[in-house]
A protein has these predicted regions:
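Conserved oxyanion/phosphate-binding beta-strand-loop segments in alpha/beta enzyme cores
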Residues: 51-73, 111, 117-128
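Catalytic domains of carbohydrate-active enzymes, especially glycoside hydrolases
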Residues: 95-111, 166-170
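N-terminal active-site wall of soluble small-molecule enzyme domains
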Residues: 118-144, 148-162
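N-terminal accessory interaction module
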Residues: 1-68
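Hydrophobic faces of well-ordered beta-strands that scaffold small-molecule active sites
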Residues: 84-88, 110-113, 147-151, 171-173
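Low-complexity, highly charged intrinsically disordered N-terminal segments
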Residues: 64-67, 90-94, 101
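Conserved small/polar residues in nucleotide/adenosyl-binding loops
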Residues: 178-180
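Active-site beta-loop-alpha junctions enriched in small/polar residues
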Residues: 89-91, 115-118, 154-156, 176
């Protein structure tokens, strides 16, 4: 396969990157010595070669969470007070990899993961799938300037906790059921 060089990132005692072979994308981690990530990956295949440990993995929710934790630029971040943020209503999660590079060196930050509780039922898509799609898109392009993740229309404490646990940088509450 071909290594997506923009995704190559240093981790403790090794490197992680996306590899594309035909239409299939895999995550590959190459380490030497002890690496805390090895125990966290959901590994499909692994081998040892010349003192190097190689893990080959699918792009799943578990591995996206590990990437967000150890490759900080691939995780959503707060938009802050500098510049502007723009959302794209990319409810299908297909545009993150295409849109992010357009914002390189700009004072505008893209909101790449957008989750709406109402739309999720129609799309059959949950919190995690939305942020994972943005994570993999950003990781593949190597976009390191930050992006936002928005979860809106949240009605329950459970949904708020999930959004925060999954790394959403902005949440919107639906207070229509609150009685004063």
């Amino acid at each position: 396969g071909k290594v997506v060089s923009a995704s190559m990132s240093e981790v403790t005692n090794g490197w992680v990157a996306l590899v594309i072979k035909a239409a299939d994308k895999k995550l590959v981690c190459v380490t030497q010595g002890e690496c805390p990530l090895t125990a966290m990956w959901a590994v499909e295949n692994s081998c040892e070669q010349d003192g190097l440990h190689v893990d080959i993995m699918s792009l799943n929710a578990n591995n996206a969470a590990v990437i967000r934790r150890f490759v900080k630029w691939a995780a959503p971040s707060a938009c802050g007070t500098k510049g502007t943020s723009i959302g794209f209503s990319d409810w299908l999660g297909a545009a993150g990899g295409c849109i992010a590079p357009l914002f390189a060196k700009k004072q505008v930050k893209p909101v790449l993961a957008e989750y709406s509780a109402a739309d999720s039922v129609l799309l059959k898509r949950n919190f995690l799938e939305a942020v994972d799609a943005a994570t993999w898109g950003v990781f593949e392009t190597g976009y390191k300037e930050g992006y936002g993740a928005n979860a809106e229309g949240l009605k329950s404490e459970e949904d708020i906790v999930k959004a925060l646990l999954y790394g959403y940088s902005m949440i919107g509450l639906d207070l229509s059921l609150i009685h004063i």
